[in-house]
Amino acid sequence: LVPRTWDDVLRAGPKLKAMGTPLGIGISPDGDSNYSLMSLLHSYGATIQDEGGNLTINRPATVEAVKVAAAIFKTGMTEDVFVWDGYSNNRLLASGKGSLILNAVSAIRAVETQNPALAANIALAPMPTTAAGAGGPRAIYVVGVNVIWKFSQNQDLARRFLVDLALDQRETLQRSLSYNLPPYEHAVPDLAALVDKDDRAQPPDKYRILADAPSWSTNIGHPGHANAAVMDVFNQFLVPKMFAAAARGEMSAEQAVKAAEAQMKPIFDHWREQGKI
């Protein structure tokens, strides 16, 4: 069984925690917590900014997402999620003492190598959504960026290389064990077939969900671009801090969202003045 909605996660949390296998969603100043909690926001249709780069964090959808996350923590998780690092959820999964984490496939790939019997009992699922499916694309993770220096003497050749690199990702997908998904649909024409039969997985079609991952995944800064302001918000961990304030009971969800807006507004104002939004 896998959770389809955040309500599923909320209902299951107390039972799983009572069994000694709590949920494991980081609420710490850490990259993985950023990815997880920004994805949770998107699940509810909440965003940091709109398509034009305007700050939109203080919305009812954000408050709802924060309330749900706080409830999930209080009933299904333990205090250590507030101090997690980038490997904490991996360790919880590998220990066999956690029931759910939010991470890339690298987490289960490690377990497949270290403990195949445990890996066979771990399922994969898309990022949960709301009952109404309000969020559309909801999962975010690392998006690679390549640049060409202005002083380069081989700019045309560099552009051709980057185009070829982006449009031929089959070997990259295979060598990364399905961790590095293609940036464009036709970069791996047989993506569905490749992830439908995985020799390392039990069952072999465990990674089938990756075939349509582009339909429920998006970039940091969605629905806008990953601009300087969004990355400042990311690097200062303002989203995890917002969730943590509510989960710890230091603020209500409404207060936590309003405080986050107050922290983010100067960042957006600064970068807009610099012409970076």
Label every model-predicted segment.
Residues 1-3, 19, 47, 62, ...:
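Short helix-loop capping/hinge motifs at secondary-structure junctions, enriched
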Residues 4-11, 80-95:
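Short helix-initiation/N-cap motifs at beta->coil->alpha
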Residues 7-55, 61-62, 98:
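Extracytoplasmic/periplasmic solute-binding protein
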Residues 10-16, 52-83, 123, 127-130:
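Glycine-centered hinge/linker elements that transmit conformational signals in sensory
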Residues 10-14, 93, 253-265:
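Short, well-structured alpha-helical segments that form the helix of a local strand-helix-strand
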Residues 17-30, 168-179, 266-277:
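Bilobed periplasmic-binding protein-like "clamshell/Venus-flytrap" ligand-binding domains
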Residues 99-104, 123:
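Paired acidic/hydrophobic, glycine-rich loop segments that form the ligand-binding mouth/hinge
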Residues 106-118, 131-237, 275-276:
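C-terminal lobe and pocket-closing loops
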